[in-house]
Each structure stands twice: as C-alpha cells, then as structure tokens.
Amino acid sequence: MNTIGLGNALVDVLLKLENDDVLAEVGIQKGAMDMINQEQMIKIRKSQEGLERSQAPGGSVCNTMRAMAILGAKAGFIGKIGSDSVGEYYEEALKKANVSPYFAKTDGISGSCTVLISPDGERTMGTFLGPAPTITPDEITEEMLSAYQCIYIEGYLLVNEELVRTTMQKAKKLGLKVALDLSNFNIVNAFRGLLDDIIPEYVDILFSNESEAEAFTGLKAHEAVKVLSEQVEIS
C-alpha cells in the first residue's frame, strides 16, 4: 500500500566524546534521556566539530517510511525542518532512500536526537524537537495526500489536536486509509479522551504494543486486542 507518513522530523546523531566535559557545559546529566532547548543544542553542535560522529534521518514514522521504501512501496514523509545543514541532510537522505520528502521549512535549526557516547561507553541522549512539532494543518495539502492510499501518523503528534484531526479529515475525504501508532503509553494516558473520539471516527489501522493497548482499554493485553479489533479494521 502506497503510504505517506506524518511525524516529527528528527535527525539521529551519534557523537563519540573525548571526555564528559561537554555534558557539564550543556547541563545534561550523564546517562540521562532529556529534552533539551535550542541553546543546549547549539552548544552540542559546536562541540561536534572535528569529532567522530554518524547521523541518519530519524523519527519513528520516518524510519517506517524508509523501511517501506526498501520493501518496494511508494512512500512519502511530511515533516517540518529548519533552514540549516541538518535539515538539508535530512531531505537529501530521504531522497536517497526513495522516500519522497514533503517538508515545511522555517528559519532556525532543525530538530535532532543526539546520543553522546562517553569514553566509558555510557550513552546520554538529548532530544531537541526544534520546529518539528510546529507543523500546521495548512502546511499539509490535499495535493500531498492525494498521491497515496494511506497516511500513517505517530501518536506523539496528538499534542497538536488540530493538526491530527484536520489531517485525518482531509485524508478520509480523499479516500485514504488512516493508520495511527499510539507511540507510548504515556501519550495514551495523556490523550485518552481525544483517542476515544478520533479512533472510531477516522482510524482504519491502529498500531500499539502491549502497554499501550492496556492503557487505552484498561484491560489486560489479550482482552485489549479484542476491544481494539472491534473499533478499527486492522489492529
């Protein structure tokens, strides 16, 4: 099934540190998994200059679209990036992976998830969302969607109800299947009311793991599967 994804556009960066000084400079606790701000992200990027690193386009939906392209499906990805080299890299990497990029662009630096690897091997993760979650419904056009049979949306975007609801409405109007990934049980707990509303109305395909299914239904996994299967075509 030809599928277009909608998710947070984040570049995954792995950086091998010569020492742990940068962690103290940036204000991240060693071994932590933290959200970081733009000032911290700029400090990290300056510290990367000349150090061994690797990077890849990331974000759960983007990774899924890349996998689908490898399997031969037509795949696209909608996201929002900044006007910097990281955003340029993200766009070019998707093209090389045969995933069509549909990016809204803004001034500033793009989002990224940076894994800082200390000399002793311990990993510290800092995620800077940047412009990724600020994409608006108006930046997602019917022209983008009409070339596909399905849209795949990550649950992390539920923080933007207008974006998710409006995009689902556009997709259904055009005859697309709507697939939703619940993403995390904390997301389910935070947006249970919204999920109760949009899943029966718009969602055809629902992805969840055991903990997410239990959080959504309030039932044990084997019972949760039955309930979910009654609400959507595929779960």
Where are these regions (language model features)?
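A glycine-rich helix N-cap at a beta->alpha junction
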Residues: 93-110
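Conserved phosphate/ATP/ADP-binding segment of small-molecule kinases
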Residues: 174-177, 183-235
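Hydrophobic beta-strand scaffold residues
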Residues: 75, 101, 178-179, 235
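Glycine-rich phosphate/adenosyl-contacting loop at the front of the ribokinase-like
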Residues: 1-78
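Anion (oxyanion) recognition and catalysis
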Residues: 69, 95, 172-173, 229
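Conserved phosphate-binding/catalytic loop of the ribokinase/pfkB sugar-kinase fold
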Residues: 102-105, 115-158
